[in-house]
Amino acid sequence: MKLKFTKMHGAGNDFVVLDGYTQPLNLTETQVRALANRHFGVGADQLLVVEKPTVDGVDFRYRIFNCDGGEVEHCGNGARCFVKFVRDSRLTDKRSVRVQVQKGVITLTMQDNGEVVVDMGAPVFEPVQVPFDASGVEARREGNDTLYALEVNGETRWVSVVSMGNPHAVQVVDDVEAFPVLVDGPVIETHPRFPQRVNAGFMQIVGRSEVKLRVYERGAGETLACGTGACAAVAAGIRRGLLDAPVKVHTHGGTLTITWNGESASSLMMAGPAATVFEGEIELAD
């Protein structure tokens, strides 16, 4: 079948975006992998699908598929591209839209300067809700946060566990460029303490309102940016007493700004760019 698509990116985190709102889409995992393949397909970190909502009071349903074909709960950089896509495609003329994701509803707002602000929801730190199996794990308090000891490649890594609708393990490192992200990342991603796997974040503190971040994403590997990862890292840093909002998060793909008041019931707000790269049509095997 022939499929129209739009290639987009948010701070270098790149996506294939599909309109499932005006046409029925029911892609298989094999088809998702084919689209995301950088050699034989379009190429992307994730595939984003716009659909009609299945709950009342929202504008759209937002579905995210990793390049390995698996569906995931949330993607912050994709959310910014999502609102640009639905506006550019004239599916809505609203500047602010409410969007259904797997674990709730988020609000996306297009700014006059072209950046998008995303209400990312409140972070969750309770291990069982991340989910993280904390039974018998060595732990220590730092500020208002709890750090857990993970054995990774023969070393002990102290991580904060956070859910931003998807699971994250965040650690602070001295030099994020020199740190073995590509070695430790896949080990943390598949650590047995995380039953749904996990996104592994590596954060270098530059100043109280500035960090550098690399994220090894669950099912995608290291990406140029990760919006939920940026939020998880900032939330952990604020709880540990290391950061003050707003925080500039520098990734390999660009800079995101994260704001949070430190209250567990309060949403994090993420601001950053969204860009269309090109539109096209691809022949996809049934």
Swiss-Prot record:
One of its GO terms (biological process) is lysine biosynthetic process via diaminopimelate. The record marks 168, 217 as: Could be important to modulate the pK values of the two catalytic cysteine residues. Substrate binds at residues 13, 46, 66, 76-77, 166, 199, 217-218, 227-228. Pathway: Amino-acid biosynthesis; L-lysine biosynthesis via DAP pathway; DL-2,6-diaminopimelate from LL-2,6-diaminopimelate: step 1/1. It is an enzyme of class 5 (isomerase). Keywords: Amino-acid biosynthesis, Cytoplasm, Isomerase, Lysine biosynthesis. InterPro entries: DAP_epimerase_AS (IPR018510), DAP_epimerase_DapF (IPR001653). The active site is at 75 (proton donor), 226 (proton acceptor). This is Diaminopimelate epimerase. It comes from Paraburkholderia phymatum (strain DSM 17167 / CIP 108236 / LMG 21445 / STM815).
